[in-house]
């Protein structure tokens, strides 16, 4: 009896990203077939059943297929913008100076608190659409611009709604420990009490978040305060991830690893102790070259240390209004290659397989393997390096989410 599939993509070149394959896991003469939204076959044409049948067959005409792209660190939902702060930075003000003067995250908090859920969704949709237009099929979206329970929940609800309005998988992270709100009067301990005793239980009860994040930095929260948040999250059964070592080395990478974090992100100032700890815990390093570029950082993340110790490397846009108003994973890959000296294979893996790993989703997406969601990006390119090499050019031919 002939094998039945829903759709078959044939005459394609595949970059499977399978972990058991070298490099990008390339198959020159490949086929992908889907059934019930998942990959039922991904491999050489020669291994595909000659009598296979499907209502729809797509001739890819030699185009490349990669897994759908994954943006594993964004702050996509927020109110207002911070273009005026961009002008201040151009005039010489630093990110820290703007934050300490009441700008930065806190200014976005005011605009986000004033916005309705519908307004938050409407403002985020164009940013999401820009990412989808480049082949993104999975995105992580954080809260963190409410800094009080109602607005944090509203942000998370808006993020979930985006996944209902567009064909994309949305993962949400609660980032209540992002900054200190004005009404806290400088009392970080009391605010962390609020995060742990009120916000986190409300978030967990509502099911609004898939993970808990925090910003551990001299201008944000201490290692001790971050540990309190993570301990509370773990008690509630929520995995954690951390904005770590971006502006200074407070031991964020090692702290994240100690809590078994899915990922530690930024990492410009991480040392070898942190890299070793991440390797042991399986914590993914999420590098954010857009933020490095936009705020004109000079300390690069220690990519060689991560390679040396086998830490997995993911990439993301860090789309946010203050330090990375970026909605292009293609440009993110180019930045990672040119600024951080990452290889083409590392960059492409970083926005597919390793992005999935950073979200705890590798069992379901991130590679072209049977059983995973049929999330594909089909490209008009001659070789995968073009995805990293080109600037301001989008070679996406088709984006497929769950087989459609």
From Swiss-Prot:
UniProt KW Lyase keyword: no
Record EC number: 3.5.2.7
Record carries keyword Aminoacyl-tRNA synthetase: no
A Pfam short name: Amidohydro_1
Location (main, coarse): cytoplasm
Residues annotated to bind N-formimidoyl-L-glutamate: 145, 320, 322
Cofactor: record remark: Binds 1 zinc or iron ion per subunit.
Binding-site residues for 4-imidazolone-5-propanoate, renumbered to this chain: 82, 145, 178, 246, 323
GO-annotated molecular function: imidazolonepropionase activity; iron ion binding; zinc ion binding
Coiled-coil regions listed: none
Any Gene Ontology biological process: L-histidine catabolic process to glutamate and formamide
Lineage top rank: taxon: Bacteria
Keyword set, alphabetical order: Cytoplasm, Histidine metabolism, Hydrolase, Iron, Metal-binding, Zinc
Cell location: Cytoplasm
Pathway as given in its UniProt record: Amino-acid degradation; L-histidine degradation into L-glutamate; N-formimidoyl-L-glutamate from L-histidine: step 3/3
GO cellular component: cytoplasm
Reaction catalyzed: 4-imidazolone-5-propanoate + H2O = N-formimidoyl-L-glutamate
InterPro entries assigned to the protein according to its UniProt record, in alphabetical order: Amidohydro-rel, HutI, Metal-dep_hydrolase_composite, Metal_Hydrolase
Residues at which Fe(3+) binds: 73, 75, 243, 318
HAMAP family per UniProt: HutI
NCBIfam families assigned: hutI
UniProt record similarity statement: Belongs to the metallo-dependent hydrolases superfamily. HutI family.
Function: Catalyzes the hydrolytic cleavage of the carbon-nitrogen bond in imidazolone-5-propanoate to yield N-formimidoyl-L-glutamate. It is the third step in the universal histidine degradation pathway.
Protein name: Imidazolonepropionase
Gene (name only): hutI
């Amino acid at each position: 009896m002939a094998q039945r599939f829903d759709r078959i993509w044939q005459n394609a070149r595949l970059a499977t990203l399978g972990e058991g394959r070298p490099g990008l896991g390339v198959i020159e003469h490949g086929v992908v077939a889907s059934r019930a939204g998942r990959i039922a076959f991904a491999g050489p044409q020669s291994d595909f059943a000659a009598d296979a049948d499907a209502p729809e067959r797509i001739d890819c005409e030699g185009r490349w297929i990669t897994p759908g792209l994954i943006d594993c660190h964004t702050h996509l939902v927020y109110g207002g913008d911070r273009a005026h702060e961009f002008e201040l930075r151009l005039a010489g003000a630093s990110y820290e100076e703007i934050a300490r003067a009441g700008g930065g995250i806190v200014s976005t908090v005011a605009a986000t608190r004033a916005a309705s859920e519908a307004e938050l969704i409407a403002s985020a949709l164009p940013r999401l659409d820009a990412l989808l237009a480049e082949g993104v099929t999975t995105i992580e979206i954080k809260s963190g611009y409410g800094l009080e329970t109602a607005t944090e929940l509203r942000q998370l609800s808006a993020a979930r709604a985006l996944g209902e309005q567009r064909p994309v998988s949305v993962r949400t992270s609660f980032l209540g420990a992002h900054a200190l709100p004005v009404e806290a009067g400088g009392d970080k301990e009391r605010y962390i009490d609020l995060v742990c005793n009120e916000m986190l239980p409300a978030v967990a009860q509502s099911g609004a978040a898939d993970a808990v994040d925090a910003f551990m930095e001299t201008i944000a929260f201490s290692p001790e305060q971050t540990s309190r948040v993570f301990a509370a999250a773990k008690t509630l059964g929520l995995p954690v991830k951390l904005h770590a070592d971006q502006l200074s080395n407070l031991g964020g990478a090692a702290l994240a690893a100690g809590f078994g974090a899915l990922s530690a992100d930024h990492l410009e100032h991480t040392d070898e102790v942190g890299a070793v700890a991440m390797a042991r815990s399986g914590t993914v390093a999420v590098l954010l070259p857009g933020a490095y570029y936009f705020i004109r950082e000079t300390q690069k993340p220690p990519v060689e240390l991560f390679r040396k110790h086998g830490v997995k490397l993911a990439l993301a846009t860090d789309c946010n209004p203050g330090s990375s108003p970026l909605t292009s994973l293609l440009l993110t890959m180019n930045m990672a290659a040119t600024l951080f000296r990452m290889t083409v294979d590392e960059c492409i893996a970083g926005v597919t397989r390793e992005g999935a790993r950073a979200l705890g989703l590798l069992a379901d997406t991130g590679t072209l393997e049977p059983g995973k969601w049929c999330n594909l990006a089909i490209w008009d390119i001659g070789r995968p390096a073009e995805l990293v090499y080109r600037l301001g050019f989008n070679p996406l031919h088709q984006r497929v989410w769950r087989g459609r």
